[in-house]
Each structure stands twice: as structure tokens, then as C-alpha cells.
């Protein structure tokens, strides 16, 4: 199949913000007359929208570029670009490491992508500057499916956590205008979107200078603007989680009873080394507040094993916190050095890799047991499930999520993606609930 010069294909790596950014890139290019290709094979432009948070993400992108290299060998005029965090993090050295690349674009420079693509036929080019005001206000994301949508509300991060590259790849915080967020939410709801997730590296830092609105006020307004749509948000920093936010979550019925609240470690000593800005008692107090106002709330978190200087006692405190809080799910990693971060500059990476892996495995084993126990309590209950798709196992089954973000699989019957269904839970694994349809709510 011949490659169409003005057709592009985006392969997205990493977080939900990157998925939203790929929608922004698509909208900007389509406005200039480019078309989205159905596959890599027919595209004249291939872009990798990249993530730099963890080393394995970099390795995955390196592997994928080897795959793209084969395409370019057969079609030398193919244009290959890297967008997102890795170009901002690794910069022009990427041209030397990966000769297949024609252009680089950082997260704040997507408006100039048409110009970069035009220049790519003659020379390599890069646009990697930060823009303290860029929020892509006025750009309506192109969407690949109609049921769920991501709406960025704040870009960048002012928290300088010792392990994290995000401030160096996405710059300082700047909030999307309050009315622009509401306009986008209203349009999505009018289009039939059933679930909207508000996005930011730290949504709790949201502040609109024009209106003075903070995140709790924005969240309340969003939930009222789309009262029939489920509202989620991520990610929250514990130190910035306010009492008013918890009240808003409790009082607005369409805000999902789920919160992702990364803690990273159960040790106050490690939290200080990580520059997290709070101690473990403050975290415990906020968990207590959440459960007081929102009984049954589903909680998830992030944990890092083997950060610089972590002792066995620190690790044991993390396990203790897990047993106490009983998170519904945990994103678990062992520490890898990210160049340029505070930890890389000032702290030795002194926990042996085999110890990191062992501690991570202990965290995984404990969480798998907790998750299985929590889901094991569900059989016999009736839950509301927003159907997302067919089950991977069978077209006769559907997969959806509760407002607590638990995955539920049940027999299809008369239901379709987008339906809100009451499901009687009949069984579970450590990650999935199984059930039978009770009734179609709407």
C-alpha cells in the first residue's frame, strides 16, 4: 500500500494526559488538511507521543523506533517525529541516538507541528521551548470513541518531587480558563459522552485567575454542567487535597466515588527525602476524612520501592500503611534514576536492584491479597455499571466499570456500550468482578 504524504499516524505512550495531547495534535493537524491514517502502513508521517516518567517507558519507545526504522528503510520519504516528554527530557541528543527521527516537539509546541512536518523533508528540526501560557485553549480534541473523554484542566507541575521528571518535561503549572473547561464539558455531554475525566499532573492545584475558582469550585460546576455524565479526575496530590473538595465529592451524585491519591511511601522519613511536602500522619488524616464523608469510597495510590536511602524499616512502614488503608488498587514500581531530578543530583541510588525487586514483589503480593479480599466481599451486591465495550474474552459478554472504578464483566443480553446497567455480582478474581444483569437503568 503506498504511503500518503499528508496522512499521519500517532502511537501514544504513557499517561492519560498524553492520550489527551494526541487528540490535540490530531485536531491541529486536521485543521491544516492532514488526515489520520488507519494504520502505520499507509501513513506518510508517524509520530510517537512519548512518556519519560519511568525508564521502561524509554525502553519501549526505543524498541518501537527499531520497528519504525524498518518502515523508513523501505520508504525513505517517511517522516518520523517524537512528541511529548522524551524530546523535552532528552532533547537533541535523540537525533544522534535515533537517526530515524526527523523532528522533535515538546508538549508546549504542538501548534507549530505543521511547520515542523513541512521542514522535515529538507532538514531535522526541533521545537522544545516551554510556554508559560500554553493550555491549548480553543483546541477541541479529536476523539476516537464517544463514551469517555479526557479534559485537561491544568498543565505542568510546580511540585519538585525528588524522583520526578514532570516539572522538567511539562514546565510550570498553568490552569485552563474556567469557562473554557465548562464549554468543553458541555459540548462533550451534548455529544453523548457518558464519562468525563478531568486531568492534570496535580488537579488540586487548579486556579483560574479570571474567576478565582479553585478545583473544588470547578469540579462542582462541571458536575452541574453535565449532571447525567459520570465525572472523574486525576491526579491529586495529598498535600493539596482540601476539605471543600471532599465535600464536593460527597454532595454531587455524578462525581465518582473513587480517588487516586499517590502516597509513594508509608515512611515519613522517605516522604521528606522525596520532597513530597507532607508526612504520613497527614496522609492518614485525609484518608480518614474521605471515608467519613464518602463511606465506601474506592481508593488507589502509587508506591515506589527502593527509593534512595530506603531502609527495611521504611519498607515495613509502607506495608503497614497498605494493611491499614486497604487500597482497592495500587500502581507499584521500583525506583529508577531519572537524570536531572533532585534525587539524581543529590542522592546516591544506594538500594541494590535485587533488594528493590524483592521489596516490590512484597508490595505486589500484599496488594494482590488485599484486592482479592475486597472484591471477594462483593458477591451478592448490586452495582451500577457503565458499559464500555465487549469483553476481551467473548462478544457475548460486556465489560464496564462501577463508579468506584472496579471492572465488571457480565453477559451481554440486550445491553450495549454506553448503557448504565444494574448488575448482581456473582463472583470475583483479584482484579475483576463477574455478574448478571439486574436491569437496564437507562
UniProtKB/Swiss-Prot annotation:
Reaction(s) catalysed (UniProt annotation): N(6)-dimethylallyladenosine(37) in tRNA + (sulfur carrier)-SH + AH2 + 2 S-adenosyl-L-methionine = 2-methylsulfanyl-N(6)-dimethylallyladenosine(37) in tRNA + (sulfur carrier)-H + 5'-deoxyadenosine + L-methionine + A + S-adenosyl-L-homocysteine + 2 H(+)
Cofactor(s) the record lists? [4Fe-4S] cluster
- Enzyme class, first EC level, given as a word: transferase
Where in this chain does the record put each TRAM domain? 376-439
What does the Swiss-Prot or TrEMBL cofactor note state?
Binds 2 [4Fe-4S] clusters. One cluster is coordinated with 3 cysteines and an exchangeable S-adenosyl-L-methionine.
* Binding of [4Fe-4S] cluster 1, residues: 15, 51, 85
The membrane-spanning stretches of this chain are none
Domain (MTTase N-terminal): residue spans on this chain: 6-122
Q: Which GO terms describe its cellular component?
A: cytosol
Which keywords are on file for this protein? 4Fe-4S, Cytoplasm, Iron, Iron-sulfur, Metal-binding, S-adenosyl-L-methionine, Transferase, tRNA processing
> Under the GO molecular function aspect, what terms does this record hold?
4 iron, 4 sulfur cluster binding; metal ion binding; N6-isopentenyladenosine methylthiotransferase activity
**Which residue intervals define the domain Radical SAM core in the entry?**
143-373
Per the record, the similarity remark reads: Belongs to the methylthiotransferase family. MiaB subfamily.
* Name of this chain's protein: tRNA-2-methylthio-N(6)-dimethylallyladenosine synthase
Amino acid at each position: 500500500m503506498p504511503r500518503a504524504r499528508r496522512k499521519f499516524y500517532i502511537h501514544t505512550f504513557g499517561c492519560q494526559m498524553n492520550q489527551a495531547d494526541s487528540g490535540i495534535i490530531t485536531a491541529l493537524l486536521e485543521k491544516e488538511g492532514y488526515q489520520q491514517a488507519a494504520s502505520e502502513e499507509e501513513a506518510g508521517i508517524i509520530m510517537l507521543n512519548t512518556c519519560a516518567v519511568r525508564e521502561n517507558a524509554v525502553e519501549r519507545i526505543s524498541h518501537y523506533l527499531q520497528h519504525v526504522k524498518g518502515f523508513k528503510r523501505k520508504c525513505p520519504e517517511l517522516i518520523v517525529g517524537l512528541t511529548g516528554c522524551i524530546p523535552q527530557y532528552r532533547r537533541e541528543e535523540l537525533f544522534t541516538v535515533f537517526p530515524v527521527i526527523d523532528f522533535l516537539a515538546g508538549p508546549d509546541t504542538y501548534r507549530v507541528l505543521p511547520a515542523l512536518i513541512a521542514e522535515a523533508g529538507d532538514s531535522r528540526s526541533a521545537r522544545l521551548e516551554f510556554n508559560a501560557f500554553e493550555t491549548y485553549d480553543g483546541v477541541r480534541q479529536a476523539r476516537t470513541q464517544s463514551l469517555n473523554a479526557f479534559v485537561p484542566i491544568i498543565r505542568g507541575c510546580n511540585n519538585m518531587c525528588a524522583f520526578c521528571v514532570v516539572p522538567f518535561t511539562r514546565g510550570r503549572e498553568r490552569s485552563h480558563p474556567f469557562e473554557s473547561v465548562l464549554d468543553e464539558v458541555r459540548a462533550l455531554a451534548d455529544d453523548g459522552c457518558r464519562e468525563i475525566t478531568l486531568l492534570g499532573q496535580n488537579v488540586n492545584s487548579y486556579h483560574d485567575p479570571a474567576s478565582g475558582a479553585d478545583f473544588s469550585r470547578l469540579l462542582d460546576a462541571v458536575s452541574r454542567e453535565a449532571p447525567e455524565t459520570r465525572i472523574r479526575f486525576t491526579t491529586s496530590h495529598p498535600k493539596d487535597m482540601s476539605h471543600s473538595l471532599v465535600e464536593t465529592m460527597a454532595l454531587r451524585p455524578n462525581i465518582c466515588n473513587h480517588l487516586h491519591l499517590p502516597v509513594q511511601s508509608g515512611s515519613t522519613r522517605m516522604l521528606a527525602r522525596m520532597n513530597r511536602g507532607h508526612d504520613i500522619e497527614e496522609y492518614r488524616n485525609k484518608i480518614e476524612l474521605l471515608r467519613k464523608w464518602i463511606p465506601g469510597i474506592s481508593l488507589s495510590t502509587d508506591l515506589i520501592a527502593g527509593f534512595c536511602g530506603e531502609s527495611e524499616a521504611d519498607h515495613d512502614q509502607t506495608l503497614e500503611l497498605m494493611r491499614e488503608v486497604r487500597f482497592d488498587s495500587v500502581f507499584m514500581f521500583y525506583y529508577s534514576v531519572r537524570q536531572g531530578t533532585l534525587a539524581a543530583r543529590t542522592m546516591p541510588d544506594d538500594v541494590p536492584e535485587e533488594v528493590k525487586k524483592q521489596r516490590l514483589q512484597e508490595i505486589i503480593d500484599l496488594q494482590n491479597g488485599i484486592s482479592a479480599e475486597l472484591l471477594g466481599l462483593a458477591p451478592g451486591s448490586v452495582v451500577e455499571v457503565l458499559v464500555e465495550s465487549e469483553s476481551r474474552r467473548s462478544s457475548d459478554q460486556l465489560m464496564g466499570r462501577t463508579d468506584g472504578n472496579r471492572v465488571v464483566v457480565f453477559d451481554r443480553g440486550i445491553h450495549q456500550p454506553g448503557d448504565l446497567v444494574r448488575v448482581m455480582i456473582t463472583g470475583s478474581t483479584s482484579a475483576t468482578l463477574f455478574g448478571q444483569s439486574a436491569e437496564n437503568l437507562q
